[in-house]
Amino acid sequence: MTNEKMIFRNRVVDKGQLRNLISWAFTYYGTARTAVMADKLKDLGFRYATKAGVSISVDDLMVPPTKRLLLEAAEEEIRATETRYQRGEITEVERFQKVIDTWNGTSEALKDEVVVHFKKTNPLSSVYMMAFSGARGNISQVRQLVGMRGLMADPQGEIIDLPIKTNFREGLTVTEYIISSYGARKGLVVQPSRTADSGYLTRRLVDVSQVYYSGFDCGTPELSIRPMTEGAKTLIPLATRLMGRVIGEDVLHPVTKEVIAARNSPISEDLAKKIEKSGVGEVVVRSPLTCEAARSVCQHCYGWSLAHASMVDLGEAVGIIAAQSIGEPGTQLTMRTFHTGGVFTGEVAQQVRSKIDGTVKLPRKLKTRTYRTRHGEDALYVEANGIMLLEPTKVGDVTPENQEVHLTQGSTLYVFDGNKVNKVQLLAEVALGGRTTRTNTEKAVKDVASDLAGEVQFAEVVPEQKTDRQGNTTTTRRTRGLIWILSGEVYNLPPGAELVVKNGDAIASNGVLAETKLASLHGGVVRLPEATPGKSTREIEIITASVVLDQATVTVQSSQGRNNYLVSTGNNQVFNLRATPGTKVQNGQVVAELIDDRYRTTTGGFLKFAGVEVQKKGKAKLGYEVVQGGTCCGSPEESHEVNKDISLLLVEDGQFVEAGTEVVKDIFCQNSGVVEVTQKNDILREVVVKPGELLIVDDPESVIGRDNTFIQPGEEF
């Protein structure tokens, strides 16, 4: 890669390309020329940005047409999972995990689909340009605009298994909006505290790392470096990690054994690429982490100063520069939550799918063990790296080649030896780094509860009884199988019912099971109450007697939306009908009450009954039903509420007063009678005058027997 070759570049320049361009200019043309080039690049950018501004409108947000199919497939998969959960094949945790992984996979697939769709239909779309220029916004935000928002976390940080299937272009439903607002709230709350934290982090870093560069070589042993990988994917290639460092010990070509780079030589971009091309897997380099200089860092361990892509100068405050470099993005990282707001993105294991129709062949030496995945499926866990073969199905005379699948330790195989597979069927998930070792397992007993009541039937389950030393018997299953619960309803038939079905008959819902006969004790007219449509009536009425009231008319009065029925009889009495038309009446029931106002009292007082009996059932508020007639006497009372000092009282308790007597200052009584005084704490509460006649009797003994009895007017006692 000489500098001449690179002068003309015909490609889209995004942030990454720009970075490469500047670093290339630095390496081959030095700082001064690069500064001029950067200036010209800036002018170029501004010139075209102002000539053709990138606008954005709703129509630029194109939703990929395959979205519907992806969502349907995901929903189908979740329905299947739900069925498996209801059948008890998987637990609640496994169901939840499967749902989350399904939606996460769908969301990722949709994101890729969005990119492909933009590339195919309109690579100059403003949304696409913004997302991939690297200047502002990224694909995860575009995914929310035109893909789907995906899974969200609730305030406790738990993932909600209801995904937001819509995007901002289509608009959210009410439920989705509520779920979505959790994340936004989280973003706003966390932001202020984070900004302060990052500034403080920078100060602390500067304080602890005031290292400056002194001396050339401390002669330390070294640190080895290799490409940074995750599973089969290389995240950072070797060349990128080597650039700007100093070699720790001679690098030899793996085949020819010639020295590619000597110890203590700095690694330029060309040398880094040369080392990577030669196939060296690991290079030993110098590092500030292993530097043995007394109070600082030596030149060889530090390597390049990235400001001018050459070895660091003596006395440079490298520690403070490092502290500032770490602290500076801190302020920007605080904005992260603010923009995305709680959208969940998880790691997806790399899926291996079949490229052909064929049969699975697992070699003998491939070490696997049966294992239950976190989704509750039966699978094989690969214990050591190996290869799986797919033998293709013959098409005519042509035998296609076998497909080899490389499996790393910790991968999960979803197919077994001898299984037939179709093209694009999922064969395995190759574990990405970090999740490979699964040593800690724990045994737990999980209960499977039935949602239905019914009779238990075993299908292919062979129960086996074991008795332990304590004499407890447990039943375990010897083979895999299903337990069916035959759900049904139990009916109690009344005595004398005649069955119309036989044992083992199939019946439809609302089918007749048995019939009974009803015999009436009384003769009369049969009447069926009006049945509500769709419901059969359970009652049959037989009218055995009827009463007719002669010369009576019924009038209806309605007040406050209620109808009152009034019955007028021949002798001009008006009754209030208590039994409204259409209600049932029992024998001896009161059906109407007389309306009469001759018995109104003019004053307050006490009621006394003579010979009247009432039924004590029911509430006093509704009145008591009179069982036996008699006399009712209202003894009137005159009450004066006073609430003044006792000194104002002019009569005594129990005194007989004439009408017109002043009982309390400025209060005169209307009737003659006996005074009753109520007082409390020298405050006069109430004065009551009980009217009546005071008679003087010569022989008190003769009248003592008439105490508490009624006396009619003119009666001699």
Swiss-Prot record:
Keywords: DNA-directed RNA polymerase, Metal-binding, Nucleotidyltransferase, Transcription, Transferase, Zinc. DNA-dependent RNA polymerase catalyzes the transcription of DNA into RNA using the four ribonucleoside triphosphates as substrates. Its cofactor is Zn(2+). It comes from the Bacteria. One of its GO terms (cellular component) is DNA-directed RNA polymerase complex. Zn(2+) binds at residues 218, 291, 298, 301. It catalyses: RNA(n) + a ribonucleoside 5'-triphosphate = RNA(n+1) + diphosphate. This is DNA-directed RNA polymerase subunit beta'. Its EC number is 2.7.7.6. GO terms for biological process: DNA-templated transcription. It comes from Nostoc commune. PANTHER family: DNA-DIRECTED RNA POLYMERASE, DNA-DIRECTED RNA POLYMERASE SUBUNIT BETA. One of its GO terms (molecular function) is DNA binding. Pfam families: RNA_pol_Rpb1_3 (PF04983), RNA_pol_Rpb1_4 (PF05000), RNA_pol_Rpb1_5 (PF04998). The keyword Metal-binding applies. Binds 1 Zn(2+) ion per subunit. Belongs to the RNA polymerase beta' chain family. RpoC2 subfamily. In cyanobacteria the RNAP catalytic core is composed of 2 alpha, 1 beta, 1 beta', 1 gamma and 1 omega subunit. When a sigma factor is associated with the core the holoenzyme is formed, which can initiate transcription.
